Amino acid sequence: MNHTKFQTSRIHRMLLPLTCTLLPAAAAQAAEAPGQKNAAGDRPNVLIIHCDQLGAWALGCYGGTQIETPNIDHLAAEGVVMTNFYANTPVSTPSRGCFLSGLYPNEHGAFKNDKQIRQDIPTFASELRDAGYTTGYFGKWHLDGNPKRPGWDIRGKDMGWSDRTSMYSFGHYKTIEAQPGTHPKFEKSVAASAENYPTDWFTDRAIAFIEEHKDERFCAMLSIPDPHGPYQVRPPYDTMYPPRQVELPATLTEEPRNDHFFYNETRNKIDRRSGKSEYDLILRNIRRDKSAYLGEIKCIDDNVGRIISYLKQAGLYDRTIIVFTADHGDMMGEHARMAKAVPLEASARIPFIVRYPKLIPAGSHSEHVASCIDFYPTILELTGTRQHGQVSGHSLARVLEGRSDRWDDAAFLRCYASVYPWVGIVTPEYKLIYGEKDPNGKALLIDRRKDPGELYNCFDDPAYSRVIRELTERIVRYCREHNDPHGEWLEKRIR
């Protein structure tokens, strides 16, 4: 498919009636337009909306209050929200590899940014394609290793995606060249319009793909490269949330009751003792970045509304499994940190929303702990697709459908990409993280029920000695079973 600038304008004109207003909750209840009979029969279509660096904390359906996200929240109200869903590694490449392959980072090969995913493993997309689905990917890929420059040229295998003409290798653009086959221009200035801003542009590509294949079984993955930095967004979103009105997190200046690396690494930078001018500058920068970050999310939400409107108009809304998620979050000032790569909630906990009324009860919430590796087997079971690949994740289908409450309730997290490698476990009650360079051998233990702000390190508290021992054994067992190299230094440490 040859996407030209002319075609981009035409698609926007075609979709203009769908973009004039937000999708209110009342409109979302409207009946679907009668569509043509789906030649694929009863098996559902699949649409995955996958964002980059979108923390669960920002969305209304996850308790966020700083922006309104009515369209994403509407998907949540009509489906199920996983409140404890985690990135196995809160960094782009390894997390995307986990989501695609159902394997841990050291198993799928892309264990840090700029590492290519193994080319010999199946993916949920290849399984669906083999089962008769037409598959298409639109947006940022970031699983192709370290090409010399960003662009539309993907070197590796298609990994199950038949249409990847609008898949680009890596990077974050604010203006997209509407001509795959050339290298898109990287513009940091906010000169983009709704016709060439990435969130809008890739949404157009996904809608066009679905329109072309609406009488087939399809799986479309819309990989939106926002709200990742550079924190800039097109008008009118760039002025919706003035920096002076942006709320700063309480943990930004509140002193943690511990001395762990994850807090102390940047704490001195935000300490008033460092000088008022520097302190004020840091706060201004955080407000500026968060202002744009919230605008980027609002733009995403509006585009989710466009997709919902199109699916309803095409008679596909109730015949499509819709998944909304992200690769990792963004600290955005929490604990005086920005970006990701740490196991704290703002970085590691991500949204995971699934809507499919035929199987999933509306308005459901699940507090079970799960992670990206669980998506592969889950989507195959939900679509009735036989699984051939060997994965480390487990299917959440019965949990999402409300048919079973049995679940292991643990997520294993690890990170190799940062200057501070770490590995750990999250359960409903606790989070235990070991870092290779922990000061004085002191790990991080959070009592999640008592301390949702993650301000207290309970590792030295004798009352938690049994918890620490049991969770440590589980981490060691995970490392052994999955050949995670973090286990080498961890076992030496705890001997």
What do these predicted ranges mean?
Residues 2, 6, 15-443, 452-480, ...:
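Formylglycine-dependent sulfatase
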Residues 449:
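Residues forming the ATP-binding cleft of Hanks-type serine/threonine protein kinase domains
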